[in-house]
C-alpha cells in the first residue's frame, strides 16, 4: 500500500484495512461459539444464562482488549508508522536492558501461533461442506475428505508466496467487506427472533457467568472466549500497511458486524436446544443459516480463511525480517517479489510454516481439537506487549497512576486468560508451546551469543584503521604485486568510525597481500526507522581507503552491491576518489571498476577462555550461523564476486601454550631408549 493511503483516511484505505488487518479476528465467528458450546458439554447442556453470559464475555473481551488496548492505545505506539511487538521494542529498548526478554518471548509466541491459525481457520471453513448434499451426492462424506481438501488449499497457499501478493491482495478488501457484511446481516436475521439477547451488552453478566453453576468449567471458559480476540495482536502488527487512521475508521463497522453475528448465533442455539443433542461435531455458525445460504457461506468462509491465513503468513515474514534486523534471529535469504515496500518472501520460513501447519492438520485432524489448543501462545504475546506498552507510556511521560492502571487492568485480564488457556496444554496447547520454546531458544542464543562475543572479544581484536591508511595506500601503488581487484570490499564493522577488526587487515596485508586500487570497509547499521536508506563516508585524507557507513531501516533490503556502485559513482563524481576508467567494457564511458567482496566468518578458537554457559551460547550462535543463509545472500551479494574467509574467534583471556625444543643430546637419549624398548625402529 502506498504511503499516501497509509497517512490519510480514505475510502480506499478503509477498504484495504478491512482486507488486510481483520482476517484473523474476522474468522473467529467460525469457531468461537462452537468452542463455547463444547466447553459445557454440547448444545443439550447449555442454558440461556450460559449463552448470554458467554456472549457478554466475548463482547467485553473484544471491547477491552481489541478496542481499548490495541485500537485506542497500542496504535499510538508506532515506530515511524510501523507497529508490532518488535517495532514497539525498538522504541523502548534504551530504557532498560531487560526489556529484550518480553520482546523475545512475545515474538516467539506470536510466530508459533502463526502455525495454528491457518490450520484452524481453513479446516473450520471446509468442515461446513461435510455431509452436505449436492443432488444425490455427498462430495465430502467424512473428516478424511475435509483434511485432504484443507491440505490442498494450504499447499496452494504456501506455494504462491514466492510470487508476492500485490495482485491478489487487491481483492482482499472487497471480499472481506462482503464477509463482514454477511456476518452482520445473518446476525441481525437470527437476532430478530429474540431481541432480548441484547442484554448480553451488560458487563455484569460477563462477570456473573464466571461463577455461575450454569457454567460447568468456571473461569476456564475464558480459554474459549479468548479465541474471539486472537487477531488483536495482528491488528497492531499490520498498522504499517494501512495506517492507524484507517484502522480506527474501519474498526467500528467490523466490531458491530462481529457482535451481531455472535448474538445471532446465540439466539439460534437457544432456539434449538435439542439440535444434534450431545454432539460436538456441529458448527452453530453454519447451522444458524438457511439451507439455501450454506454453500455460499462456505465458499465465502473459505475465502475469508484463506485471506486470514495469507495475512498471517506474510506477517510472519515481516516479523522474521524485523527480528533479523534487531539481531534476534540469524540472517536469512529474503526475496522481494514486487516493487512495493513490505512485500517480502523468506523461502526457509515459508517451508517451515508450511510443514508445521500441515503437520498440525494431520495431528489434530478436526477443528474442534485445534480449537482446544488454539490461543495459548497468543495470550503470552499479549501479556508481553502490555509490559512493553507500559514502558512506552513511561517514555511518553504519561502519569504514573494512569500507567499503573493500564498495567494492572490489562495485566490482570490477560493473566486470567493465560491461566485459563493453560488448561489447553494437555489438549494440544503443548504443540505451540514447544514451537514457541524452540523459536525462543534460537532468539535467545543468537541475541545473547552476539552480546557475549562483542563483550568478550580480546582487547587487541580491534585496531585503528587510520593507522594503516599509509600502508594500504603504498600497497595499492606497489605494481610489483599483482592487482587483486579494482575495488576490494570488506563487509566489516568499523566501530566509532575508526576501529576495525585486526582480522580484516590481516586478510589484506599478512595472508597474501591483496593489492587494489581502492579498499572499502562497509558497515551496515540497522536503524530504528523502518525504511532509512542513507550513507556516510570517511576517507581518512586518502583517495583509496574508504570507510562506508550504510544506515538501513530494519525493514529495508540490504542490497550492498547495488548501493556501493551508486556510492562509488557519487564519490568519483565529486572528486572524493579517483575515476576508474575501464578499457575493456560493454558499457562505453564506464568509470566504475570491478568489485571483489570479502566476508570474514568466525570459527571458535581452542584458545577461547569463557565460562561454560557463555561458551555454550557463543558456540551455539556460531553453529546457527553456519546453518542459516550464506552471508553473501544477506548482503545482496549473490551474483557478486564474493570470497568468504574463515578466521579463528578468540574470546576472553587467551590460553597460550609454550612449546620447548629438546636439546640434541637429550633427543638422542630419548631415541635410544625408545629403540631399546622396541617402540622405535632404526
Curated annotation (Swiss-Prot):
Biological function? Transport of potassium into the cell. Likely operates as a K(+):H(+) symporter.
Q: Record's InterPro entries?
A: K+_transporter, K_trans_C, K_trans_N, Kup
Name the catalysed reactions: K(+)(in) + H(+)(in) = K(+)(out) + H(+)(out)
| Coiled-coil segments | none
In which family does this protein belong, per the annotation?
Answer: Belongs to the HAK/KUP transporter (TC 2.A.72) family.
Q: How does it sit in the membrane?
A: Multi-pass membrane protein
Question: Which cysteines are cross-linked by disulfides?
Answer: none
Molecular function GO terms recorded: potassium ion transmembrane transporter activity; symporter activity
Report if keyword Transmembrane helix is assigned.
Answer: yes
Fetch the Pfam families from UniProt.
K_trans, K_trans_C
Please give the superkingdom of this protein's source: Bacteria
Q: What is its main location?
A: membrane
Instruction: List the HAMAP family hit by this protein, alphabetically.
Output: Kup
Which segments cross the bilayer? 13-33, 55-75, 98-118, 138-158, 171-191, 217-237, 250-270, 295-315, 344-364, 375-395, 405-425, 428-448
What Gene Ontology cellular component terms go with this record? plasma membrane
Q: Indicate where this protein resides in the cell.
A: Cell membrane
Q: Which keywords annotate this record?
A: Cell membrane, Ion transport, Membrane, Potassium, Potassium transport, Symport, Transmembrane, Transmembrane helix, Transport
Give the protein name, as stated in the record: Probable potassium transport system protein Kup
Q: Which organism is it from?
A: Lactobacillus gasseri (strain ATCC 33323 / DSM 20243 / BCRC 14619 / CIP 102991 / JCM 1131 / KCTC 3163 / NCIMB 11718 / NCTC 13722 / AM63)
Amino acid at each position: 500500500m502506498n504511503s499516501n493511503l497509509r497517512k490519510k483516511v480514505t475510502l480506499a484505505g478503509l477498504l484495504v484495512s478491512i482486507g488486510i488487518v481483520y482476517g484473523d479476528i474476522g474468522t473467529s465467528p467460525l469457531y468461537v461459539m462452537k468452542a463455547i458450546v463444547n466447553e459445557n458439554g454440547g448444545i443439550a447442556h447449555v442454558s440461556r444464562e450460559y449463552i448470554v453470559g458467554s456472549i457478554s464475555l466475548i463482547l467485553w473481551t473484544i471491547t477491552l482488549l481489541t478496542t481499548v488496548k490495541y485500537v485506542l492505545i497500542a496504535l499510538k505506539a508506532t515506530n515511524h508508522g510501523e507497529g508490532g511487538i518488535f517495532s514497539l521494542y525498538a522504541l523502548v529498548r534504551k530504557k532498560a536492558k531487560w526489556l529484550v526478554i518480553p520482546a523475545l518471548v512475545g515474538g516467539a509466541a506470536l510466530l508459533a501461533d502463526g502455525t495454528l491459525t491457518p490450520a484452524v481457520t481453513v479446516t473450520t471453513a471446509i468442515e461446513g461442506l461435510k455431509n452436505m448434499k449436492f443432488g444425490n451426492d455427498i462430495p465430502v462424506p467424512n473428516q478424511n475428505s475435509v483434511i485432504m481438501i484443507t491440505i490442498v488449499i494450504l499447499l496452494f497457499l504456501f506455494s504462491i508466496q514466492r510470487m508476492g501478493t500485490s495482485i491478489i491482495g487487491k481483492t482482499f478488501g472487497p471480499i472481506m467487506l462482503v464477509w463482514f457484511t454477511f456476518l452482520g446481516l445473518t446476525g441481525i436475521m437470527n437476532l430478530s427472533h429474540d431481541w432480548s439477547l441484547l442484554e448480553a451488552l451488560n458487563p455484569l453478566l460477563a462477570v456473573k457467568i464466571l461463577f455461575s453453576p450454569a457454567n460447568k468449567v468456571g473461569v476456564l471458559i475464558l480459554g474459549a472466549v479468548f479465541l474471539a480476540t486472537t487477531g488483536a495482536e495482528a491488528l497492531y502488527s499490520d498498522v504499517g500497511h494501512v495506517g492507524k487512521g484507517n484502522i480506527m475508521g474501519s474498526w467500528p463497522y467490523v466490531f458491530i458486524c462481529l457482535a451481531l453475528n455472535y448474538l445471532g448465533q446465540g439466539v439460534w442455539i437457544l432456539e434449538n436446544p435439542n439440535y444434534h443433542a450431545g454432539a460436538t461435531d456441529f458448527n452453530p455458525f453454519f447451522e444458524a443459516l438457511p439451507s439455501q445460504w450454506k454453500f455460499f457461506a462456505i465458499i465465502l468462509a473459505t475465502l475469508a480463511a484463506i485471506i486470514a491465513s495469507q495475512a498471517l503468513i506474510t506477517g510472519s515474514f515481516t516479523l522474521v525480517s524485523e527480528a533479523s534486523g534487531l539481531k534476534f534471529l540469524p540472517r536469512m535469504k529474503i526475496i522481494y517479489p514486487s516493487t512495493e515496500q513490505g512485500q517480502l518472501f523468506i523461502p526457509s520460513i515459508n517451508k517451515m510454516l508450511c510443514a508445521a501447519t500441515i503437520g498440525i492438520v494431520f495431528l489434530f485432524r478436526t477443528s474442534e481439537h485445534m480449537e482446544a489448543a488454539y490461543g495459548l501462545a497468543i495470550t503470552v504475546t499479549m501479556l508481553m506487549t502490555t509490559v512493553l506498552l507500559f514502558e512506552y507510556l513511561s517514555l511518553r511521560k504519561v502519569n504514573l497512576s494512569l500507567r499503573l492502571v493500564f498495567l494492572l487492568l490489562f495485566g490482570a485480564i490477560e493473566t486470567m486468560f493465560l491461566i485459563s488457556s493453560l488448561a489447553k496444554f494437555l489438549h494440544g496447547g503443548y504443540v505451540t508451546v514447544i514451537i514457541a520454546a524452540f523459536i525462543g531458544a534460537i532468539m535467545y542464543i543468537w541475541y545473547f551469543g552476539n552480546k557475549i562475543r562483542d563483550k568478550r572479544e580480546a582487547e587487541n581484536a580491534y585496531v585503528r584503521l587510520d593507522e594503516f591508511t599509509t600502508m594500504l595506500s603504498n600497497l595499492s601503488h606497489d605494481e610489483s604485486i599483482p592487482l587483486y581487484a579494482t575495488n576490494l570490499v570488506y563487509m566489516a564493522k568499523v566501530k566509532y568510525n575508526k576501529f576495525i577488526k585486526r582480522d580484516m587487515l590481516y586478510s589484506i596485508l599478512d595472508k597474501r597481500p591483496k593489492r587494489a586500487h581502492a579498499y572499502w570497509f562497509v558497515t551496515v547499521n540497522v536503524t530504528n526507522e523502518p525504511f532509512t536508506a542513507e550513507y556516510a563516508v570517511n576517507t581518512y585524507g586518502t583517495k583509496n581507503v574508504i570507510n562506508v557507513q550504510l544506515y538501513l531501516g530494519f525493514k529495508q533490503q540490504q542490497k550492498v552491491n547495488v548501493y556501493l556502485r551508486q556510492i562509488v559513482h557519487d564519490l568519483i563524481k565529486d572528486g572524493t576518489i579517483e575515476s576508474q576508467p575501464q578499457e575493456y567494457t560493454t558499457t562505453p564511458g564506464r568509470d566504475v571498476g570491478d568489485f571483489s567482496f570479502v566476508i570474514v566468518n568466525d570459527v571458535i578458537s581452542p584458545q577461547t577462555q569463557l565460562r561454560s554457559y557463555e561458551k555454550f551460547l557463543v558456540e551455539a550462535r556460531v553453529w546457527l550461523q553456519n546453518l542459516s543463509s550464506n552471508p553473501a545472500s544477506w548482503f545482496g551479494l549473490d551474483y557478486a564476486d564474493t570470497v568468504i574467509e574463515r578466521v579463528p574467534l578468540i574470546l576472553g583471556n587467551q590460553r597460550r601454550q609454550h612449546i620447548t625444543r629438546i636439546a640434541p643430546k637429550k633427543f638422542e637419549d630419548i631415541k635410544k631408549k625408545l629403540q631399546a624398548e622396541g617402540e622405535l625402529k632404526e
